[in-house]
């Protein structure tokens, strides 16, 4: 019996996706998906993001949940075998814990992710779009050595720090996210800086010590890690994490989830079976997926 298709990382137009919950559900139904986790980008502090075009704005969190519940009703009608899970992709940044607890309340599944390195500014000064937050000092300005590591339109962090230091700081932040008392369900795209390796930003240092540290952090904190097919659609043209890092996670006994990181309905469940084969080659015999009530279920590969 083949492993059911599960996709534990998807986005809608509430954050930076282009599709609705219902469109993702329809795509999942066509692909025969068993579990679909809806993980829009969680609300961010105004210090990190001046315009709320890549996150669920705080003012729309209730609307977001209501839209999900309507999609769950639709799924029950058009795809009775599809389990829809309410979650968020939650950015980790210094001091994020209070924000994430408040804004992700009610989520059954949380993807911890690191997209930012360095000082995030006054993260308690309010959320993007709230009255008065236009006066919040923006973090991550050129020359600060802080900011987004995956934003192709603004590479100042890479230019200021260089690829080797970006990787070091990313690994530091990733391990801090694993160790956070938030207890993220799974850690998304564990080696995200690889996105730009084929564009002149490949590290010159040996990444093995960083990989070993990341594997130990995930093991010691009880985190799951994600095998993501998103890299296949990027310039790096491979899975996150790299085979070497995934083998280390496997040897450390770190369980995995699998996700497409779909930002449009057409990418829901993209290459999930390929990800299963990739994980099996790295030493995995099973994949985990969340249940709608926040528990885990395991499927053999």
Give the role of each language-model region.
Residues 58-220:
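Extended substrate/RNA-proximal surfaces in nucleic-acid metabolism proteins
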Residues 267-301:
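Mid-to-C-terminal alpha-helical segments outside catalytic/metal-binding sites
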Residues 9, 28, 110, 189, ...:
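Conserved, mostly hydrophobic/aromatic
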Residues 29, 178-180, 250, 280:
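Non-catalytic positions within long, well-ordered alpha-helices that form the structural scaffold/packing
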Residues 3-7, 35, 81-87, 108-111, ...:
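Structural preference for beta-strand elements that scaffold enzyme active sites
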Residues 206-260, 264-268, 285:
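Active-site-adjacent C-terminal substructures of enzyme catalytic domains
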Residues 1-94, 127-130, 136, 193-198, ...:
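An N-terminally biased module of ancient metal coordination in phosphate/nucleic-acid-related enzymes
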Residues 98-100, 244, 274:
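A short acidic, amphipathic alpha-helical/loop segment
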């Amino acid at each position: 019996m083949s492993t059911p298709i599960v996709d534990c990382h998807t986005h809608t137009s509430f954050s930076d996706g282009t599709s609705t919950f219902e469109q993702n559900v329809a795509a999942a139904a066509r692909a025969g998906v068993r579990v679909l986790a809806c993980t829009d980008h969680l609300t961010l502090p105004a210090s990190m993001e001046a315009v709320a075009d890549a996150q669920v704005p705080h003012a729309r969190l209730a609307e977001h949940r209501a839209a999900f519940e309507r999609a769950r009703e639709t799924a029950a009608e058009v795809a009775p075998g599809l389990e829809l899970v309410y979650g968020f992709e939650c950015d980790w940044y210094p001091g994020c814990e209070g924000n994430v607890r408040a804004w992700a309340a009610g989520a059954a599944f949380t993807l911890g992710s690191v997209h930012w390195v360095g000082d995030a500014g006054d993260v308690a000064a309010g959320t993007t779009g709230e009255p008065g937050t236009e006066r919040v000092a923006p973090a991550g300005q050129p020359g600060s050595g802080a900011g987004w590591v995956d934003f192709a339109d603004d590479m100042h962090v890479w230019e200021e720090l260089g690829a080797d230091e970006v990787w070091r700081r990313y690994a530091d932040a990733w391990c801090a996210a694993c160790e956070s008392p938030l207890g993220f369900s799974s850690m998304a795209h564990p080696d995200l800086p690889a996105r730009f390796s084929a564009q002149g930003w490949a590290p010159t240092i040996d990444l093995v010590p960083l990989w070993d540290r990341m594997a130990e952090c995930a093991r010691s904190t009880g985190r799951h890690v994600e095998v993501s097919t998103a890299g296949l659609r990027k310039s790096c043209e491979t899975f996150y994490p790299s085979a070497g890092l995934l083998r280390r996670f496997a040897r450390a006994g770190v369980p995995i989830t699998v996700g497409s990181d779909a930002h449009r309905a057409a990418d829901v469940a993209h290459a999930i079976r390929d990800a299963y084969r990739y994980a099996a080659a790295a030493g995995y015999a099973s994949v985990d997926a969340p249940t709608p009530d926040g528990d885990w279920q395991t499927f053999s590969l």
